Amino acid sequence: MLNLKIRTEYSFRNAFGPIETVISACSGDAVGVTDSGTWGHVKFAAKCAEAGKKPIFGVEISVVEDASERTRQPSNAMCFLAKNNSGLKEIYLLVTKSTSAENFYYFPRLSYSDLFDVSENIFIFSGTNPNWGMIPLSRKDDLYIELNPMSSRKALEFATAKGFKTVATSDNYYPRVTDKKAYEVLVGRNRTDRTSPMHILDEWSWREAVPWGTEEAVNNTYEIAAACDVDLPTAKMVKFKTGKTLKELCLDGAKRRGITLDADYSVRLKRELETISSKKFEDYFFVIADMIDWAKERMLVGPGRGSSAGSLVCYLTGITDVDPIKHGLMFERFVDATRDDLPDIDIDFQDDRREMVFEYLTKKYGPEKVAHLGTVSRYKAKSVISEVGKELSIPPWELQDLKAGIIERSPGDERANKCIMDTFSTLEVGKVAVGKYPAIKVASEMEGHARHCGTHAAGILVTDSPVSEFCSVSAQTGAAQIDKIDAEKLNLLKIDALGLRTLTILQDTLDQVGWTRQDLLNCPTQDESAFRILNDWKFAGVFQFEGQALQSVARQIKVSDFEDLSAITSLARPGPLMSGGTSQYIKRRTGQEEVAPVHPVFDRITKVTFGIVIYQEQVMEICREIGQLTWTEINQLRRAMGKSLGQQKFDQFFENFKKGAEKNGTLEKKATEIWQHVHAMGAYAFNRSHAVSYSFLSFWCCIAKSRFPLEFAAASLRHAKDEGQGKRLLREVVKEGLEFIPFDRDKSDVNWTVQDGKLIGGLTGIKGIGNRVAKDILERRKLRQPLTPRQDTLLSLGKTPYNDIFECERKFGHIKSDPAAHKIVSKISDIDEITEENYGSFVFFGKVKDREVKDLNERPGTRKVSGASLSLNLTLEDDTSQIICTIDRFKYPRLGLPIVADGKIGDWLLIKGNSRKGFRRIYVEKYRNMD
């Protein structure tokens, strides 16, 4: 018996089982996958190839009497299996139809009438215990009645009476008997009350579970598998119609940018064009260049992102605005000479206009050839612990230490999905948890498992033929049922078009002052007024510099060169900060430490970074020039760095480096010394192309802020993502010397504006006034018409979140400056000082914004606790940030109850509490009501 109806993790919270586990649980030389969608097809094909099994591609879709009726109807969960590639394309279209607005109702559906339109290129399985009235009697050649453990004898009787063939199937929801607990946690215990087998059955088990099953049903599994022959199609490159060659486009770009193609430029351009041509990537560059050229006429486009800034072709065609020769960037970091897959060109657009780019591509290439990329979300270690804890009724506070202590690894690490397993087996906190709750071990099976699917935030697919020839497309969302990795395997052209709020803010600023994008590009990168913004610590609104880590590094370096921006943004990351590389760079950059010579080539490559390896490109150059590594080895090394696989993986290249260095005339001792320098920072090295590209965005913000501080602040406030961010930003710009008025009855516009040298708050900042009402008020003001009574009342009150942005400082600044004088022995912190990394004991003031009482015994399906079960969550805010503070069930009677009984929203509390590593939350020890 072959298993032709198999569910995997790609049935998303309806079945458990990684594809490789599912395939290994199936006997025979062929396997059929029938998830509720086609997300897993590409990975399924790859894993079948590894296992030496034939893949049968299918899908399970519910069929109702009339899917156009938006009512709950009896349904048949029928399976459709592709006989050939035409059948596979038809399956993709069936999935698309089932997700249409007309058919979708709680879940994807097809109508009974659709079955008559299914071609002979598809096998149909009846489903388990179907509505027999919805089995089309005319489809006897390729519609099979399922016999499985959940079927009744009526299935066999119906097939015999009506002349249908039968097929033996499992009705699996997990691969092995031992996976039942993981499945229960995944879908919820109430879903698994049936007694029949839910795992994959072999023939013997099937005969035992279906004693009335027939030999014909078993034999038909082999006949069906033999009749199926599908190869997943791969896409051809999109053909871009143009009368120019890529070289001609580059030469035109050089003239437009005023570049004389001297030896450096001409040799580099020739090399890049030859590489691109040899891989037949020209059309890809034309597609991207055309899209960006169109976008630049309508919005602000980022200067570059990722490795594409290392390409001179990208610069000359206008794809990027970063000169790779001027900034010392590598083409090989962008196009891997040893691989034929398309390079990634990521582009930033204004976040409020990004969708226009998708619309342009749809119009140019046709709606059937453009789709949003899909994405699959997977269970991370900490979320798995939470899910399992709920299912096993483990009190959440008993899992806090375990979650805080879980081993953390980067996504590219080969044991990235084994963090829980390794925590349980190697760390004391894990062993204690397993000892107390043995069933929690199931969490290790769920880590990395598919959780849900969605639409990729940036990815767009463009194909030369309809996208539906390669994968299903959700009719409602326009998202393809395929993720980034699988799309690359099918050679689908993928464009990463990201929305960036900073670009929206910059364009808003330019619009206010009459500048254009070219004015920004014309600003010299040695503009001292821009650097002065950072040196004066005026970080508010400056891209990348709003985080504490970057600000800390910037405060220690007097920025005097554009190169400083790239270095700071590359060094203010956990790896360099923890390894000591950042502090060493600061010492050398500020003259506190000499730069000792190491090797002429090494010294030349690291001159710009004071003898410290900061960038991946530096590692690649050192390994190429000194270690004589091949490009294949260098690109393997680059991928190891890019995926942050750590020092052990990085050091695997040392032996070959040492041998190559010796051949190059470098003694083993010196080669080892050079490698030690590379080793110290190489595993944490950053992509220089990306660092330089994003430094331009930071630089543009500094330019805008130095020349137009009020307009830049107004734009930043207009596009703040929420009230909290707006208040924090306003506090900072006021500290930097700007003046503001929260609201002016006669001057306020819809949103923040600049008038009379001040920031004026908008009408929508007033509680109770939205965009529509604000526009009506402005129209009445313009026409000198009276306001409505309600409008007049709201304006008279003038209550905005910005009326008292320094309330905490005003009320308690004297206490914070001298806590000892007020009998407070601890330093009083600001809430923004409490982070996931900066944890421990804190004392701080906070205004109650929200409060929520929770009863542990009211959670459905959980074990009841005896005694105290109530806890209190408080949302507190000061002048810097917000944080959630928890009073647990043991402290609730003493601390929580008085707040609930006598306190109110708006009270100021002085809190003493603790936070734990990895969690930005305070557990309250004591408090004092200051009102």
What are these regions (language model features)?
Residues 180-247:
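Active-site or pore-adjacent capping/gating segments
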Residues 2, 30-33, 194-196, 242-931:
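Noncatalytic, beta-rich nucleic-acid-contacting surfaces in large DNA/RNA-processing enzymes
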Residues 71-73, 116-118, 452-454:
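Solvent-exposed alpha-helices and their adjacent loops that cap or buttress functional pockets
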Residues 35-41, 63, 149-154, 173-176, ...:
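Acidic, metal-coordinating catalytic cores used for nucleic-acid/nucleotide bond scission
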Residues 5, 35, 55, 84, ...:
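Divalent metal-coordination and catalytic microenvironments
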Residues 38-103:
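Hydrophobic or amphipathic alpha-helical targeting/insertion segments
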Residues 16, 39-53, 69-72, 180-184, ...:
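Glycine-rich loop at the start of a catalytic domain that most often binds anionic cofactors/ligands
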Residues 2-25, 29-33, 37-51, 93-177, ...:
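Domain-core and long-helix interface of multi-subunit machines
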